[in-house]
Regions:
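Short linear capping/connector segments at secondary-structure termini
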Residues: 44, 76-85
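Alpha-helical structural segments
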Residues: 9, 26-46, 55, 59-66, ...
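Helix-turn-helix
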Residues: 1-26, 30
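Solvent-exposed, amphipathic alpha-helical segments
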Residues: 38-49, 115-126
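A short secondary-structure junction motif
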Residues: 38-42, 67-71, 75, 98, ...
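Amphipathic alpha-helical packing segments from all-alpha helical-bundle domains
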Residues: 59, 69, 82-114, 128-132
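A conserved beta-strand->loop->alpha-helix hinge within the catalytic CA
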Residues: 5, 51-56
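Amphipathic alpha-helical interaction segments
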Residues: 55-59, 63, 111-119, 135-136
């Protein structure tokens, strides 16, 4: 992804894009953040309405998969990977906390909620299937 390709896709001049964004990193971050907010809002909504642990954990898994699928091209872009790698440590803790929040009522303590969130985040990104992940998470939630 380049600012030039973004400008072309939007039908505007490259300079116009730079009027709003300092570079492709800022543009990509805004796009990712906008979708991530929708993802967490949906997860929180399901958590409020759902008493069944498997349903909630499946929702989180499916939302993570959908998010990654939507931005797969961006996650494969070498320049984008360099940017994400540089900021990963800073944002990973925040992502984990956001995913731990809806599962906290299912857990005995904050550590378990963070552990479940980390497992979901890590193993979903690694491509593991829901059934394999949930077999382990179910033991923590019981």
């Amino acid at each position: 992804m380049t600012i030039r390709s973004v400008a072309k896709a939007c039908g505007v001049a490259v300079g116009t894009v730079y009027n709003y964004f300092s570079g492709k990193e800022e543009f990509a971050a805004l796009v990712l953040l906008t979708r991530w907010k929708k993802t967490t809002e949906h997860i929180d909504s399901v958590a409020r309405e759902c008493a069944e642990p498997e349903t909630l954990v499946r929702c989180i898994y499916q939302e993570l998969c959908a998010y990654m699928d939507q931005y797969r091209v961006l996650f494969q872009d070498e320049a984008a990977i360099a940017v994400f790698t540089a900021s990963f440590a800073r944002y990973h803790e925040l992502l984990r906390a956001q995913l731990a929040k809806p599962v906290r009522p299912l857990c005995q303590n904050d550590f378990e909620a963070e552990f479940v969130a980390e497992a979901l985040l890590t193993w979903t990104v690694a491509g593991e299937g829901f059934d394999e992940i949930y077999q382990v998470i179910r033991k923590i939630l019981n």
